[in-house]
Amino acid sequence: MSVKIRMHRAGAKRKPFYRIVVADSRMPRDGRFIEQVGYYNPVSQPKELKLDEDKIFEWLQKGAQPSDTVRSLLSGAGLMAKLHDAKYNK
């Protein structure tokens, strides 16, 4: 089972709202997921991003792969650098 951290679309038509979830890669985009670890609202000004850093860090250490979009959001929040430091600076 390959686990991904990706975005699960919610909200109304033309007003997207994304939940950041941990899901099996074989599940559909808006299908079943294992755990919700944050959300992203690109419509609000300024754009709203909330992440449960402890849970995300735990899943990344277990081997979950973030999607490209989620990876860029995590990099902007500083989580990818934190993971890199924990992994290589023992």
UniProtKB/Swiss-Prot annotation:
GO terms for molecular function: structural constituent of ribosome. The keyword Lipid biosynthesis does not apply. GO terms for cellular component: cytoplasm; small ribosomal subunit. One of its GO terms (biological process) is translation. It comes from the Bacteria. Pfam families: Ribosomal_S16 (PF00886). Belongs to the bacterial ribosomal protein bS16 family. PANTHER family: 30S RIBOSOMAL PROTEIN S16, SMALL RIBOSOMAL SUBUNIT PROTEIN BS16M. This is Small ribosomal subunit protein bS16. The gene is rpsP.
